[in-house]
Amino acid sequence: QMDVQSTNVALLDTISREEIVAEITGVADKYQEMQVQHAHVRFHEHKEKLRGTPLIQCQIRLRTNRGQLAGSGEGYGADHAFHVALDKLERNVLELKGINADEEYRGQLLRKLGEL
């Protein structure tokens, strides 16, 4: 199981630690060559509220063998904030995967051109 550190767990209202670990693992698995060494999920409550639900900021940071990746987002309730941050993190993971694939393709193309 992945090592996930959560800060301000008192703000977790409708989402559990197990769900957080499962969701982050799902995002990390989209890029097999990336091994996650550590994940940190941080929640911060703002004073603003909507119908009694506080505005929460969530930051997710992954330390991997490919460098650091992060995603952050705000939402009313920990669940909403976490999923906004998770979407941004997922986009960053897929972008990193695409950049590495482009570099690999470029190297293959240059080798082919060198052989001609």
Predicted regions and their residues:
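Polyanion-binding surfaces on beta-sheet-dominated domains and ring/shell assemblies
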Residues: 1-57, 61-116
